[in-house]
Amino acid sequence: MAILNILHYPDPRLRRKAQPVAAVDKSIKKLADDMLETMYQAPGIGLAAVQVNVPKQVVVIDISEDKSSPLVLINPEIVARQGKAESEEGCLSVPEIFEPVTRAAEITVHYLDREGQKQELQTQELLATCIQHELDHLEGKLFIDYFSTLKRQRIRKKAEKRQRLSA
């Protein structure tokens, strides 16, 4: 397995729409494994392939405290949403920013697992929030897109300054 480079906002590659995975083969399984390792090392609880410069519909999530419950979602699609819930979110591609975002409280998602098997998951709370956040990445959307224009401008300036300092 390998640690992958995580793209940081305002990198325009984060705005690309991910393409569906045609077949769950060795390369997709390796990508998922590398993404999990990268996410754990970061550390984070979710990562979309777009964030590691691979525009494919692959997401990894693990909200467990001990990294024991990895979830791989390939070609995920939310098929039902219910209620509203607000929770604080952060993002590995937008470091040091944590803000409340309102999303569906409960969701049902269809996806292929790491073995290419069709799955359905009904979930709520943190896992529902995390899935919605990561699926936004597959559409080229970031959690900061839910913020006001002024707040997004401040975050962009901060991100650009951080890039200059790290270059």
Curated annotation (Swiss-Prot):
Fe cation binds at C91, H133, H137. One of its GO terms (molecular function) is metal ion binding. It catalyses: N-terminal N-formyl-L-methionyl-[peptide] + H2O = N-terminal L-methionyl-[peptide] + formate. Binds 1 Fe(2+) ion. Its cofactor is Fe(2+). It is an enzyme of class 3 (hydrolase). GO terms for biological process: co-translational protein modification; translation. It comes from the Bacteria. Its EC number is 3.5.1.88. CDD domains: Pep_deformylase. Signal peptide: none annotated. Removes the formyl group from the N-terminal Met of newly synthesized proteins. Requires at least a dipeptide for an efficient rate of reaction. N-terminal L-methionine is a prerequisite for activity but the enzyme has broad specificity at other positions. NCBIfam families: pept_deformyl, PRK00150.1-3. Belongs to the polypeptide deformylase family. This is Peptide deformylase.
